[in-house]
Swiss-Prot record:
Family: Belongs to the TtcA family.
EC number: 2.8.1.-
Name of the protein in question: tRNA-cytidine(32) 2-sulfurtransferase
Protein's organism: Coxiella burnetii (strain CbuG_Q212) (Coxiella burnetii (strain Q212))
Cofactors: Mg(2+); [4Fe-4S] cluster
Amino acid sequence: MSEKRVEKKLIHYVKKALNDYRMINTGDRVMVCLSGGKDSYTLLSLLNSIRIEGNYKFDIFAFVLDQSQPGWDDSALRGWLDDKKISYEILTRDTYSIVKEKIPAGKTYCSLCSRLRRGIIYRYAEEQGFSKIALGHHRDDLIQTLLMSVFYNGQIRSMPPKLLSDNKRHVLIRPLAYCQERDIIKYAMEQQFPLIPCNLCGSQKNLMRQRVKRLISDLAKENPKVPSNILRALSNIKPSQLMDHELWNFRELNVD
């Protein structure tokens, strides 16, 4: 697939998500969380292109959190943002030391790291008056999270495309919800984003998400529709076919 075709495909699915879930309203100030990875770069790049088109009237701002990880170098990232003329701030908070201190060696850092990062993001967004917080989770993240929740937590839940935070103060959006990771990888390579690797968790193997990712990949080899079917299931709920008493009154179910 050519460079333009990949970009066109991704923009199509981002716009579909924006419209399906009314993610962005006229006049919104959207804070895009830029981690330095391929997903957040792609999100920021596509939203910036859509903003420049002019059909959606909103402002974007890139928020970068420097967590004081060894080897962190944001010089190329700064250059990329300056070149794109995107407003940004790089905030330094040493969550790295906290995570290393609290989590035993060999254990997964992701959960605590995410909680610390989320708190900083929410606080910054509130202080600066941003109306939306945009995250770079894509289609594969959504379907993997669903299966992880089922397998390891006994819950049917995932990452919704649009979410009101628990404290009711922030609206989170995931414009890449319909985008496939393989297309994002192609786009990131073509754009030559100056990626910053995560040295905190990048070396941890056999994480739950990687196992679920392999499972989905293996199933897709037998039936390519498996990933899209899982995604479609998230918006095709049949409460009467499940076992949740809060969603369906099974006790009072009788023949009239």
